[in-house]
Amino acid sequence: MSELIFEISQEADGGFVAECLTESIVTEGNTWDELRCNVREAVRGYFFDQPSKQPQAIRLHLVRDEVLATA
């Protein structure tokens, strides 16, 4: 596997949630740096018994939803 893609959403409290689009990996972090560390750790844990299947790269895709008032 060459790359895993995580969709990142920001919670109302400011923290972040990361969900992998192709594997059953979900994690969270209070800050962006903590999230990055937790994603790496979650991926290592998910593939601990299959080191040859570990991805070469991890892509974090931040999704932000914003509603703008029209009046």
Annotated model-derived regions:
Residues 14-50:
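Amphipathic, hydrophobic secondary-structure cores in small proteins
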